[in-house]
């Protein structure tokens, strides 16, 4: 079983390696006199117990590592598990189609919605094609085009946030990166349809916020949301990225802390060990939250929806 264990999970990795070795040995020689099944079961129970112990006391830096886990489910994974009849739409109708943003119409429990999200890649070629989940201006303009389409057809909007940040390249800046982000912030605040945003991995600065202005903002348990990466903060304050763990703790980037500050509404629990351990389970929990949020927002008239969203934005910074 290959789970790409992180540094703080190495004791778990050692147990899982022993389990794999015993299973391999059992397959090679079925006439062994020892009862391998009992030993494997004992080790599995020990692994679960150890995982619970480690994950009960995670620090902010460890959670940041989990948010970046290479096997963590991405937007298209959640679309596959939660929605039906997904029809992807491409292009910003001005420059190009940015593969770091995916979006289109789909059905959530039979209800038409517009779903938009950042998309990273897993293999090298896919990572490059998706630009490591860092959108250029055309990505945010594509997202806005789909949001405006959703408003015209009175479709709720669901966004999934998972980016280290907007792409900072020269070309992106020349094409108006800051303007594209600012325009999205302005336009999203005035959309006359329900908007539900969920941070599923990294919520990096303006690159995340550009599809993160909504009536409901949720976070998965082991996701992060911040104005800068811990490494970036450490490089500025302490002149060394090695201080990233200290920066992560000081910045308050985790879901429980942000909920305390009333910057997000809900924390969606993940399976033991993180979302990558059981993508279907976390997708089921996320779907339940999305349906509950939609049910709540459906009771509001358009003016009430806009007023509540405005008040939400104006209350940022007040605990």
From Swiss-Prot:
UniProt KW Metal-binding keyword: no
**Catalytic activity, reaction form:** N(6)-carboxybiotinyl-L-lysyl-[protein] + acetyl-CoA = N(6)-biotinyl-L-lysyl-[protein] + malonyl-CoA
Keywords for the protein's UniProt record, in alphabetical order:
ATP-binding, Cytoplasm, Fatty acid biosynthesis, Fatty acid metabolism, Lipid biosynthesis, Lipid metabolism, Nucleotide-binding, Transferase
Compartment(s) of residence:
Cytoplasm
Q: Indicate where this protein is primarily found.
A: cytoplasm
An annotated GO cellular component: acetyl-CoA carboxylase complex
**Per the UniProt entry, what is one GO biological process?**
malonyl-CoA biosynthetic process
Among its keywords, does the record have Lipid metabolism? Answer: yes
Q: In which pathway does it act?
A: Lipid metabolism; malonyl-CoA biosynthesis; malonyl-CoA from acetyl-CoA: step 1/1
Q: Which top-rank group of organisms is this from? A: Bacteria
Identify a single GO molecular function assigned to this protein: acetyl-CoA carboxylase activity
- Can you state the subunit structure given in the record? Acetyl-CoA carboxylase is a heterohexamer composed of biotin carboxyl carrier protein (AccB), biotin carboxylase (AccC) and two subunits each of ACCase subunit alpha (AccA) and ACCase subunit beta (AccD).
Q: What does this protein do?
A: Component of the acetyl coenzyme A carboxylase (ACC) complex. First, biotin carboxylase catalyzes the carboxylation of biotin on its carrier protein (BCCP) and then the CO(2) group is transferred by the carboxyltransferase to acetyl-CoA to form malonyl-CoA.
Q: Give the record's family classification.
A: Belongs to the AccA family.
Q: This chain belongs to which protein, by name?
A: Acetyl-coenzyme A carboxylase carboxyl transferase subunit alpha
| UniProt gene name | accA
